[in-house]
A protein has these predicted regions:
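Conserved NTP-donor binding/palm subdomain of two-metal-ion nucleotidyltransferases/polymerases, i.e.
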Residues: 1-123, 129-215
Length: 215
């Protein structure tokens, strides 16, 4: 393991409150390697929170800290934007008679400490969509119905695969609408997945930020 990788792991421990300082200080050149590593791991925001907690003698160079901080501001603004877009798309499906659950990505924010929540590097929006309880007419999955709704909203057709389709609702954020949260290649395992999803889909709950996550 390189020194940059070791420092990266120690910064994560500091961010989580499991240590207070690095095992040894870094030179300016080593800090550049550390920054390259955290960028590669998409952990720029989380590690910067740790950098701010370092004692003065271990602090990263001022120039690097400023550039790091600017990137973190971008991440925080991006998180706010995507959370708002999650609210828009879930409300859109809600009005159309569907319940939805934000998978992976933004839903993971609620498992982060409040201090780190908006520093997570965001990506696209993955949304599991299904009919509300009592309005499913005995159908476990409404794949064709959901696809038609999306195509009508966009005024065009999009690529559809086994478990999701794209919904080009926002100019800079990809939305993947999932008919099921996941799938297996083995048909027997896949059937078990579908049964489990069907049995637990109503355990989805609404969070204060209007982003739905599984209990």
């Amino acid at each position: 393991m390189t020194k940059a990788e070791t420092v990266f792991l120690e910064l994560l421990q500091i961010a989580l409150g499991n240590r207070s300082r690095l095992s040894e200080p870094c030179s300016d050149a080593e800090w550049e390697e550390v920054y390259s590593t955290v960028k590669k791991q998409a952990m720029v925001g989380i590690t910067f929170y740790a950098v701010k907690l370092l004692p003065a003698e271990q602090m990263a160079p001022k120039r690097r800290r400023y550039q790091w901080a600017m990137k973190v501001l971008e991440i925080e603004e991006r998180n706010k934007k995507i959370c708002y877009e999650c609210q828009i798309v879930t409300e859109l499906f809600d009005k159309a008679g569907y319940q939805s659950c934000v998978l992976k990505g933004q839903s993971n924010l609620f498992f982060y400490p409040a201090s780190l929540r908006m520093m997570r590097q965001p990506g696209d929006i993955d949304l599991w969509v299904f009919r509300k309880e009592g309005d499913d007419h005995g159908k476990p999955f409404h794949k064709r119905e959901i696809i038609d709704f999306i195509w009508k909203k966009m005024g065009k057709r999009t690529e559809v695969n086994l478990h999701h389709t794209d919904f080009d609702l926002f100019p800079k954020t990809l939305v993947e609408v999932h008919f099921v949260p996941s799938f297996a290649v083995n048909p027997f395992t896949n059937r078990k997945y579908y049964r489990w999803f069907e049995a637990h889909k109503q355990s989805v709950s609404s969070t204060p930020a209007n982003i739905n996550i599984l209990d």
